[in-house]
Structures are given as C-alpha cells and as structure tokens.
Amino acid sequence: MVEMLGVLAIVSILSIGGISAFQKAMTKHKINKTTEEFSQFINELLRYSKDLKRMHTNNETVEQAKIASSIEFFLPSTWRRQYENLYDSMNHRIYPFIRNDQTDVRHKYLSIDYHMPRGKDNTQFCIALYDMAKPYAEVIRKVFVYTKATESEQTKVQTAVWGTIDCKKNRKCLNDITLADMKRYCDTCDNEKEGCSFVLMFRL
C-alpha cells in the first residue's frame, strides 16, 4: 500500500511537470507565431513605404485611423481592425503612425506602437520582439520600450537602441544588444498595471 502511494505521488509529480513543460512550449509557440505575423506586417508596411510617405503632406502627424483603413487589405489573416485600432492574434493593440523628425522636418518616420496588456508572458514576448527587430536594423531609426501604470502617471521610457544609420557616439546599437540587455529593457513589462509598449521607428 505504501509503495503504491509512492508510485502515485511520483506519477502526480511527473504529470504536473509534464503539464508545465507543455504550457511553456505552447507559450513559446504562440509568441513565435505572433512575432512572425508582426514581421510579415512590417514587411508589407515597408513595401508600401513610398505610398505611406505620400500620405504625410504637411507637418502634422498622420494618425493611425487613416493608416489603419489604408492597410487593412494586407493584415495577417488572424489580425483584425476595429475602427482606428489594429489587433493581432494575441489581442495586442498596434498603432502605426507617421511623423516628422522633431529636429529636422525633412525626415519622416513610420512609428509602430505595439501595446501589450498586462500579462505574465510580456517580458518573454518583449525579448522576442527585440530579436525580431534586429534584421531591420538598416531601416530602423530606434527601438524602445515604455510603460505607464495609470493615465495620471508619467510614462517610463527604457533605454533606446538605435538602427545602423543612427547608432553614433555613445548610443546603444540594435545589432549589438545582448540577451541580458533585452531582459533589462523588458523586465518592467511584467510589473505594470497597464502593461507596456514596444515602439519601432522606421526611416521613410
């Protein structure tokens, strides 16, 4: 009887371990699939970069409402548009908009604000987004993470990392960041009441 109870206890522990491993594998698969879709979305945006640039006819920011309606036809099949908002398969909200450089209006940038609601996998997902961004270093101006616990709180911006062209002087280069760097930038994502946002700025 005692031996049987011991066997059952071992089976129970192994079952719990198996469930935990399965859950981790499913989370990793979901994150990989979602970042692949996001990369697909970025590729399409950059493909139409000249058209997007023409939308910016003055010094005003082109809001996401105008862009969202223009690009709906190439959204990944698991994404959806709801008014001016885009949502991916994990219900993360994506805000694309175009604006001038604050110091030189001749330069225009496509910004994508990728908002992750509060969740336990945000740090892991944020790290995956940094990895996804690296192949775009030649066309990226900068990448950064920001958090904001409440509407009344000041936005907390993590260290920006820079694309190849803009990585000068003492700036941190996107291609040079390590896993430890990414963890440091992303750690706050799991601690904020309102989640965090991953921002990419592309040169147009």
Language model features with spans:
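N-terminal single-pass transmembrane signal-anchor helix
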Residues: 1-26, 34
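Glycine-centered flexibility motif
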Residues: 6, 53, 72, 87-92
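Alpha-helical protein-protein interaction elements
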Residues: 14, 65-66, 71, 154, ...
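Membrane-proximal N-terminal amphipathic helix
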Residues: 20-56
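Short, glycine/small-hydrophobic-rich surface segments
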Residues: 45-83
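Intrinsically disordered, low-complexity regions enriched in Pro/Ser/Thr/Gly and acidic residues
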Residues: 79-204
